[in-house]
Structures are given as structure tokens and as C-alpha cells.
UniProtKB/Swiss-Prot annotation:
Reactions the enzyme catalyzes: 4 porphobilinogen + H2O = hydroxymethylbilane + 4 NH4(+)
The UniProt record lists the keyword Membrane: no
UniProt name for this protein: Porphobilinogen deaminase
One GO BP: protoporphyrinogen IX biosynthetic process
Broad EC category: transferase
Cofactor note: Binds 1 dipyrromethane group covalently.
HAMAP family registered for this protein in UniProt: Porphobil_deam (MF_00260)
Native organism: Burkholderia mallei (strain ATCC 23344)
């Protein structure tokens, strides 16, 4: 490679940290290919890593430490220089990044909706009473319990291929997955129905890819700038602001979804109890040109949820989760 052909300040090699699941590697390869197209003289590599979240498969995330389990090892690689950037599904990234790290880019968003997947049934309504439905999140569990109390909702862990394998061997009559992951892996044919956001409000950031860097690496942020999608980033920022303000994590069935309509960003947020017996929702819209605008919109929705009693729900669930983790230690 002729270093003289590289843009000024661009290194000969860029390294992307990624989890090693098939979906995570697809996402990392997607970013790698985009960077190679932008900077053909730069050698862009992927550093595959196994995170603690990938290793713990017998318990739900809410019982073992939450979303941070999927990113800590990748952040360690950023901190010590083994990697220049890390690629994440934004719904799996904690709402507040640790000190010293920054979200440098949000790429154009894929479908944020949840997908109904089954080999024998066309929709949730078609399932018989008592049918076993698998889900990996408290948010989806609460939705199912609220809207379909006749179903038997059970935890579902593992990567995407593992979850589909559990369905195929008959452990579940149906499972609920993020549509984005299925589409990215060419598995859209497995989707029997897409759940309308009014019926299953997505998790904050669902369907979006985020690129994390060490905050000190302004050089990397500059190289990633062409990959940043401003409209997607503002929508995700508003969603994450709702969750951040309420202390959202894997312990809480909290959802937030923003969509552009008529030049305005429309944001809906929801908090519920895990049994689905109580569901709170709030909506607001505004013209949002900057991250500050998106944050303000998110705060309006979180404030509205707090006025309805969301704080008490969140605090009770977080306390219960902490007690469960302490008991299982």
C-alpha cells in the first residue's frame, strides 16, 4: 500500500470492534464496506470479540446486569487502542455512555418495528390460548401480557440464529424479534407479521446502528462523519432522551419511538409494569434541527410520563431487579 495515497491524518489501518454473532458481524462488515468505499487506501479490519452478554444465556439481561454486558469488552478495546471504533445495535447500548466514550455516528435507520415469527401461525391473534411465545425483553413481555393475556410468555435468550433454532425445534409457538436484524441477515421471509408501533412500541434506538469511539479520538469522529445520518440521529437522540431521563434499562419495560412527519419529529414514549397491568404513554412533536432540540422533545415526553406516575414504576422495578441480582450472586 502506498501511504502517499492516504488522506492526510488517516492511518494505514482502521480497526472495528464487534461482537462475534452473525448479526453483529454483518453490522461491522456493513460499516467496514462503507469505510473502504470512502477511504480505499485504508485497510479496514474487524476485531471480533465475545462479550459477557454473549456468554450468559441462562438468565435474562435484567437479572445479570443489563445492556452494558454487550459493550464493555468493546469499550475496553477502544480505550487501550486495540480498536478505533465499535459498532453497536443502538437498542443494546446503555442510555448513558461511560466517561471517556462518545457516540460518533448514527447510520441510516432500518425498520424499527418488532416482528412476529412463527412456523404455524400468521399473527399473535391467531395463536391459541396458552401458546408459548418467546421474547428477549421485558418491554415485549409487558406488551404481550397487556394485549394478549391468554398467551404464555417466556424468556428467550441467545443470538438471532439461536432464537430461531429454539422456535424451529418446537420450544415456542412463536417468538418476537426486531425486524431490522432479520432483514439485515436476509431472513425477512421468516417474518409472518410486522407489529404496528401502536401495538408494540419499539425500544429506543431499535433498528439503528451506532458507532462508538473513545471521546479523545476527534480524528476518528471526523473520518466517520460521512456515515452519519442526521435525521436518524435526531430521532434516536429523542428516544434515548426519554429512556435516559427515566433511568431506563433492561429492568424496565420502557419504549420510545420517533418518526419524522410533515417536517416535525413525532415522539411517543411508554412505561409499563412487567405484568402489563399498567401502561403509561405520552406523545409530543416539534421541529427538531439540532441534538438539543431532540433532547428537549425527549424531556417533554419523559416529563409527561413522570406526571402519570412513571417514576414510581421505574424505581420499583429497578429496586426489585437489584434485589434479584443480589440474591443470585
Amino acid at each position: 500500500m502506498n501511504s502517499e495515497t492516504l488522506p492526510a491524518e488517516l492511518p494505514a489501518t482502521l480497526t472495528i470492534a464487534s461482537r462475534e454473532s452473525r448479526l453483529a458481524m454483518w453490522q461491522a462488515e456493513h460499516v467496514r464496506d462503507a469505510l473502504r468505499k470512502l477511504y480505499p487506501a485504508c485497510d479496514v479490519k474487524i476485531l471480533g470479540m465475545t462479550t459477557r452478554g454473549d456468554q450468559i444465556l441462562d438468565r435474562t439481561l435484567s437479572k445479570v446486569g443489563g445492556k452494558g454486558l454487550f459493550v464493555k469488552e468493546l469499550e475496553s478495546a477502544l480505550a487501550d487502542g486495540r480498536a478505533d471504533l465499535a459498532v453497536h445495535s443502538l437498542k443494546d447500548v446503555p442510555m448513558a455512555l461511560p466517561e471517556g466514550f462518545a457516540l460518533a455516528a448514527v447510520m441510516s435507520r432500518e425498520d424499527p418495528r418488532d416482528a412476529f415469527v412463527s412456523n404455524d401461525y400468521a399473527s399473535l391473534d391467531a395463536l391459541p390460548a396458552g401458546a408459548v411465545v418467546g421474547t428477549s425483553s421485558l418491554r415485549r413481555e409487558a406488551m404481550l401480557r397487556a394485549r394478549h393475556p391468554r398467551l404464555d410468555v417466556r424468556p428467550l435468550r441467545g443470538n438471532l440464529d439461536t432464537r430461531l433454532a429454539k422456535l424451529d425445534r418446537g420450544d415456542y409457538a412463536a417468538i418476537i424479534l426486531a425486524a431490522a436484524g432479520l432483514k439485515r441477515l436476509g431472513l425477512a421471509a421468516r417474518i409472518r407479521a410486522l407489529l404496528d408501533v401502536d401495538d408494540s412500541l419499539p425500544a429506543a434506538g431499535q433498528g439503528a446502528l451506532g458507532i462508538e469511539i473513545a471521546a479523545r479520538r476527534a480524528d476518528v469522529a471526523a473520518w466517520l462523519a460521512p456515515l452519519h445520518d442526521h435525521a436518524s440521529a435526531l430521532a434516536v437522540e429523542a428516544e434515548r432522551a426519554v429512556s435516559r431521563a427515566l433511568g431506563g434499562s433492561c429492568e424496565v419495560p420502557l419504549a420510545a419511538h420517533a418518526v419524522w412527519r410533515g417536517g416535525e419529529l413525532h415522539l411517543t414514549g411508554s412505561v409499563s409494569t412487567t405484568d402489563g397491568a399498567r401502561v403509561l404513554a405520552a406523545h409530543a412533536h416539534a421541529r427538531a434541527a439540532t441534538a438539543a432540540d431532540a433532547l428537549a422533545l425527549g424531556r417533554r415526553v419523559s416529563d409527561a410520563l413522570e406526571r402519570q406516575g412513571a417514576r414510581a414504576i421505574v424505581d420499583a422495578l429497578v429496586a426489585a431487579s437489584a434485589q434479584a441480582q443480589k440474591g443470585g450472586a
